Amino acid sequence: MVAYALTSMLLSAGALVAAAPSGLDARDGCTFTDAATAIKNKASCSNIVISGMTVPAGTTLDLTGLKSGATVTFQGTTTFGYKEWEGPLISVSGTNIKVVGASGHTIDAAGQKWWDGKGSNGGKTKPKFFYAHSLTTSSISGLNIKNTPVQAFSINGVTGLTLDRITIDNSAGDSAGAHNTDAFDIGSSSGITISNANIKNQDDCVAINSGSDIHVTNCQCSGGHGVSIGSVGGRKDNTVKGVVVSGTTIANSDNGVRIKTISGATGSVSDITYENITLKNIAKYGIVIEQDYLNGGPTGKPTTGVPITGVTLKNVAGSVTGSGTEIYVLCGKGSCSGWNWSGVSITGGKKSSSCLNVPSGASC
């Protein structure tokens, strides 16, 4: 009787299993090797694999509007055809999205085909690399990227995004005319964390133009313009608040710590912390904070429309070259305040004789 009951139970369970759906809809897992098919079918897939894809010239690998909770995996080598255009080469948007790199993958943007020493200031029209726009509670991790034509990640209109273990290697551009190859440009976004990035480029490692609650931690930045707030001003959104940069090394770069606001503009920069920062072989400025910035070059005359308040520097140490300047602060009258610096030690370069309106709590 017991055996019969047990057999009946097992048969019933088997019938239930057989009758149940497989749990994986045919469209849940999608591997794409061409861009057109990926773009057409993306919205019906929960797990998207971009495998060994060559994206045609002038085409964005458009992964916007994905299913909530979708995962995108880059596998093998992803490449892009050559055309002069604005880009982007890749675009992703959605809620609870995960973008990851499979072991051994590479995303090769072939920037050398566009590099001409002019970046986005002229010459060839160069595509931006990756638009991370309109993302909510999402993550991008473990991507290996090389040779972006100009700026790499544009992060805009985002709420809650973690970028972890991103490698961008544009070092070939040091001698081949790469310019304006910012790694991470952030605007109008909140709750952003960039961690464990390894960046070799020719412009800002991180540039925060507007946004709040932004963390940059345990990153390696080499060859570029440092970790920057700004330039702030002259846009629709001109407020930066609540930024922490920590545990980061900036080497072989023009600048280390940089905060720059646009001459004559309005906005605000507040609650900024740089802590446990190591500088190595900085060519121009170890620490530079200026309220006179223009793309054509600083004016030397600070303006007060974008006050810089609550700047904490703690344990920022390292070296600049003999021709570089250790610290340079140029503030308008009364427009820099509430600064607190401790453990700041920059050596090897020149002392600036042009600092102006340095607030108490800081030194120049």
Swiss-Prot record:
It is found in: Secreted. GO terms for biological process: cell wall organization; pectin catabolic process. GO terms for molecular function: polygalacturonase activity. Its main location: secreted. Residues 1-21 form the signal peptide. PbH1 repeats lie at residues 158-188, 189-210, 211-231, 240-261, 269-291, 303-348. The keyword Membrane does not apply. The active site is at D203, H225. InterPro entries: Glyco_hydro_28 (IPR000743), Glycosyl_hydrlase_28 (IPR050434), PbH1 (IPR006626), Pectin_lyas_fold (IPR012334), Pectin_lyase_fold/virulence (IPR011050). Disulfide bonds join C30-C45, C205-C221, C331-C336, C355-C364. Involved in maceration and soft-rotting of plant tissue. Hydrolyzes the 1,4-alpha glycosidic bonds of de-esterified pectate in the smooth region of the plant cell wall. This is Polygalacturonase. It comes from Cochliobolus carbonum.
